[in-house]
C-alpha cells in the first residue's frame, strides 16, 4: 500500500541503509497499536470498539514518507532565484535572508521528530560576477567538512512541528574555517543548496542509529552563491525592499529605493567635531580677536567679541586648533601686553581697531575687570582701587584725559603702545604702566637725559619672583598712587593719574635713560618708612629731591 503512493514535486523520501522498506513498515506497525488505545481511551485487554480499525488505519498512514513540507514565502524566493540569490558570509557569522521557513504536515502527532538543515555544494565550480551576470571562474575549492544545523526545538512531537511555521532564521553562515560556534562553514563565490532533513527520533531522542528513518526535502529556489559583499545591485534592492532590518536604507516610502544614492555616497558620515568647526569658523572670520581669547579658559568666560554682539563661545577643546591668523599687523590694533613664558599666557583681550568706526557700545564693553584669580593675589586695600581702565592700559579714551587727542586723530604708533623694545627682556612677564610726564625741567640728576616716562618699579622688579610677574601691572598702579601721597617738590600735584599710555615716537635717548635709571635706583634717597605691600612685593615711596 505504501509503495503505491507517489512523492510530491517538492519532496523526496530517503531511507538510511538497513532493512527493506517493508521491514521498516513492519517495525513501525506496533506503534499504531499502542497509539490506538490512547486515542480511543479504552482500557487494556478490552475488546476493540467498532472504530478501532479506522484509527489504526489512519495512524498507519502517518509514516515518515507521508510528511509534506511547503516552503514559506516561495514567491519571494523565486524573485531572488531569478536574479541570482546571494548570501553574505562573514567571520562572525551572518544570517540568511530570506529566512528558511517551512510549513510541515503529515506527521504523527505523538511521534518525536528532529529537524535539521545542511548546506551542500550545488556544483563543482567557482563563480565570478562579470558584466552584470555570474560566470564560471574555475574549479571549486575543496569542500569543508559538512556541518548540520539542528533546529533548537528538536526533538519535538509532530503536533509541535505542525502547529506553526518552522523557522531556521537563527542559522548563520561563516567563512571562518576554525569557527567554534557551530555555524555552517562555506567558501566564498561558490554555489550552495540548502537541504531540510526530518528524522524520527529514536528511544534516546537522538538520530544516527542503524534503523533511523528520515526524509530530505530540497527546494531548488533556495540555492544561492556565497559572497562577502553583494555583487548584483538587483539583489541589494530586493534585500532592502523586503528585509525588515534594512529600514535605515529606505526613503520615506518603503517602496522608494535609494541604492543609487548609497552607491554615490550622498550620505556621508559627519562627525560632531567637524560640525563644530563649521559652526565656529564663520564667527572666527568675523572677529579678528579670537586668537588672544584662546589664552585661558577664564578669558573665554569673561570677555566677548568686539562686534557688539554677545556671542556664545564654545569650549576651548571644541575650537579648531589653527585659529590664530598667520599674519598680524601690530599697527592696526590697540592691544594689551601679551608675552609667552613656557605654557603660561597673559591675555587681556581688550583691543580696538584704529579703523573701526565709533560704535554705540559703551567703553565698559572693552574694559573688563581682571580675572578672579588675579584679584586674589592683590592686597585687599588696593583691590578696589585698581580699575579696569588702569589694568588694560588702553589709551585714546577721548575727552577724559586732558591734552590727549582721540584715537582717530593720531597716526598709528610705529611699535605697540608699551614700547617693548625699550626694556631689556626678563625671564617672565614684564607688564608696566608708564606715566606720561609733561614737558618740564627735571632735577639735576636728570639733566643729561631727555624727557621720558618714569619706570617706578624697576628696582622692585629685579627682586620679584618670576612666578608672580603676571601681576606687576596692578603693583605699578598701586605704586603710582603711593607716590601721589608722598611729598615731592619736583613734580606738581596737578598731574593726575593717567588712564593709560600716551602714544608718542620712541626717544632716541631711551636706552641711555633706562641705563641711567638702573644705575640711580639705589642712589636715590628714600625718606618714607611707610611700606605698601602687594601681590608682587614691597615698594617704598620715592622722593625726587
UniProtKB/Swiss-Prot annotation:
Ranges annotated as biased composition (Basic and acidic residues): 482-505
One GO CC term, this protein: chromatin
Region annotation Disordered: where it falls in the sequence: 479-509
The keyword Manganese is assigned to this record: no
An individual GO BP term: embryonic lung development
Domain of life per record: Eukaryota
Molecular functions (GO terms): DNA binding; DNA-binding transcription factor activity, RNA polymerase II-specific; RNA polymerase II cis-regulatory region sequence-specific DNA binding
Modified residues (Phosphoserine): 507
DNA-binding span(s): 71-251
InterPro entries per UniProt: p53-like_TF_DNA-bd_sf, T-box_DNA-bd, T-box_sf, TF_T-box, TF_T-box_CS
Pfam hit, one: T-box
Signal peptide: none
Key words, A-Z: Developmental protein, Disease variant, DNA-binding, Nucleus, Phosphoprotein, Transcription, Transcription regulation
Compartment(s): Nucleus
Alphabetical list of PANTHER family matching this protein: T-BOX PROTEIN-RELATED, T-BOX TRANSCRIPTION FACTOR TBX4
Role summary: Transcriptional regulator that has an essential role in the organogenesis of lungs, pelvis, and hindlimbs.
Disease field: Ischiocoxopodopatellar syndrome with or without pulmonary arterial hypertension: An autosomal dominant bone disease characterized by patellar aplasia or hypoplasia and by anomalies of the pelvis and feet, including disrupted ossification of the ischia and inferior pubic rami. Amelia, posterior, with pelvic and pulmonary hypoplasia syndrome: An autosomal recessive, lethal embryonic syndrome characterized by absent hindlimbs, pulmonary hypoplasia, severely hypoplastic or absent pelvic bones, hypoplasia of the sacrum, and ambiguous genitalia.
Descriptive protein name: T-box transcription factor TBX4
Species this chain originates from: Homo sapiens
Amino acid at each position: 500500500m505504501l509503495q503505491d503512493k507517489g512523492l510530491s514535486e517538492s519532496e523526496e523520501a530517503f531511507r538510511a541503509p538497513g532493512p527493506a522498506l517493508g521491514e521498516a513498515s513492519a517495525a513501525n506497525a506496533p506503534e499504531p497499536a499502542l497509539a490506538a488505545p490512547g486515542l480511543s481511551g479504552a482500557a487494556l485487554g478490552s475488546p476493540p470498539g467498532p472504530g478501532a480499525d479506522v484509527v489504526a488505519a489512519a495512524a498507519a498512514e502517518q509514516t515518515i514518507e507521508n510528511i509534506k513540507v511547503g516552503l514559506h514565502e516561495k514567491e519571494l524566493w523565486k524573485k531572488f532565484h531569478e536574479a541570482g540569490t546571494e548570501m553574505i558570509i562573514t567571520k562572525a557569522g551572518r544570517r540568511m535572508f530570506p529566512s528558511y521557513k517551512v510549513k510541515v504536515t503529515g506527521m504523527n502527532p505523538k511521534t518525536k521528530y528532529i529537524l535539521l538543515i545542511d548546506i551542500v555544494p550545488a556544483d563543482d565550480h567557482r563563480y565570478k560576477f562579470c558584466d552584470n551576470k555570474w560566470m564560471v571562474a574555475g574549479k571549486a575549492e575543496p569542500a569543508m567538512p559538512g556541518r548540520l544545523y539542528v533546529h533548537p526545538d528538536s526533538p519535538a512531537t509532530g503536533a509541535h512541528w505542525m502547529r506553526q511555521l518552522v523557522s531556521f532564521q537563527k542559522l548563520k553562515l561563516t567563512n571562518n574555517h576554525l569557527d567554534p560556534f557551530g555555524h555552517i562553514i562555506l567558501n566564498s563565490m561558490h554555489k550552495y543548496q540548502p537541504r531540510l532533513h526530518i528524522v524520527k527520533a529514536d528511544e534516546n531522542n537522538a538520530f544516527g542509529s542503524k534503523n533511523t528513518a528520515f526524509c530530505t526535502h530540497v527546494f531548488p529556489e533556495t540555492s544561492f552563491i556565497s559572497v562577502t559583499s553583494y555583487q548584483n545591485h538587483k539583489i541589494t534592492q530586493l534585500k532592502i525592499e523586503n528585509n525588515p532590518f534594512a529600514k535605515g536604507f529606505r526613503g520615506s516610502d518603503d517602496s522608494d529605493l535609494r541604492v543609487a544614492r548609497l552607491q554615490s555616497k550622498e550620505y556621508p558620515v559627519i562627525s560632531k567635531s567637524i560640525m563644530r568647526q563649521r559652526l565656529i569658523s564663520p564667527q572666527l572670520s568675523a572677529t579678528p580677536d579670537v586668537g588672544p581669547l584662546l589664552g585661558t579658559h577664564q578669558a573665554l568666560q569673561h570677555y566677548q567679541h568686539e562686534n557688539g554682539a554677545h556671542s556664545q563661545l564654545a569650549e576651548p577643546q571644541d575650537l579648531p586648533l589653527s585659529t590664530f591668523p598667520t599674519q598680524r599687523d601690530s599697527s592696526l590694533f590697540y592691544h594689551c601686553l601679551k608675552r609667552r613664558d613656557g605654557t603660561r599666557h597673559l591675555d587681556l583681550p581688550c583691543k580696538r581697531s584704529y579703523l573701526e568706526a565709533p560704535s554705540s557700545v559703551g567703553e565698559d564693553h572693552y574694559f573688563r575687570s581682571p580675572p578672579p584669580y588675579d584679584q586674589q593675589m592683590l592686597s585687599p586695600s588696593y583691590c578696589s582701587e585698581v580699575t579696569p581702565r588702569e589694568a588694560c592700559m588702553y589709551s585714546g579714551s577721548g575727552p577724559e584725559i586732558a591734552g590727549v587727542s582721540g584715537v582717530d586723530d593720531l597716526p598709528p604708533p610705529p611699535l605697540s603702545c608699551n614700547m617693548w623694545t625699550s626694556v631689556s627682556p626678563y625671564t617672565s612677564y614684564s607688564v608696566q604702566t608708564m606715566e606720561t610726564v609733561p614737558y618740564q625741567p627735571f632735577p639735576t640728576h636728570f639733566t643729561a637725559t631727555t624727557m621720558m616716562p618714569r619706570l617706578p618699579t624697576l628696582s622692585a622688579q629685579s627682586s620679584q619672583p618670576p612666578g608672580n610677574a603676571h601681576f606687576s601691572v596692578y603693583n605699578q598702579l598701586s605704586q603710582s598712587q603711593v607716590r601721589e601721597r608722598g611729598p615731592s617738590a619736583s613734580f606738581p600735584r596737578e598731574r593726575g593719574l593717567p588712564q593709560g599710555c600716551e602714544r608718542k615716537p620712541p626717544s632716541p635717548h631711551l636706552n641711555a635713560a633706562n641705563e641711567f635709571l638702573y644705575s640711580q635706583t639705589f642712589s636715590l634717597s628714600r625718606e618714607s618708612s611707610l611700606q605698601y605691600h602687594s601681590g608682587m612685593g614691597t615698594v617704598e615711596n620715592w622722593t625726587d629731591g
